[in-house]
Amino acid sequence: IAQTPPPYQPGMGDLMVTIVQPRHLKLGLAGQARNWDYADYAQHELEEALETVEKHIPKWRNLDIGQLMAATVKQPLEEVEKAVKAKNAVAFDAAYRQVTEACNACHRSANLPAIVIKVPDASAFPNQEFRVTRP
C-alpha cells in the first residue's frame, strides 16, 4: 500500500520568494503609482506574509524570527501604513525605503548579506495594472 507523503513544509527561502518578496514588490509598485487603495491592501498583505513566515518558521538558524522581524520591519511597516492612509507620497517613499533596508538588515542578521532587496524599478507582474484605474 502506498503511503501518503507528508504535507509539504516550505522552507524559509520558499516562503520569502513566494509570499514575502512578491508582496514587497507589489507594495512598492502600488506606492510608486500612488494607488493608495491598492497600497493599503498590499501593505496588509505584506504584514500577513511576514506573520505566516513567523508562524511556520519561528526559529531559523538559531534566530528568533518574531524578535528579528519586530526589531527590523515592524516600525517601518507602521510608517508605510501611516503614509498610505495620509496619501503622502514623500512619506511613503521614505518609509518604503526603510522597509526595504529593514529587509536587508534582517538578511545581514541571518548571515545572508548576499540577499539584497531593492526598491522596484520594474514589475514582475505584466498582467497587473498598478496605476489607479476604475472599470
State the predicted function of each range.
Residues 5-135:
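Sequence context surrounding c-type heme c attachment/ligation sites in exported
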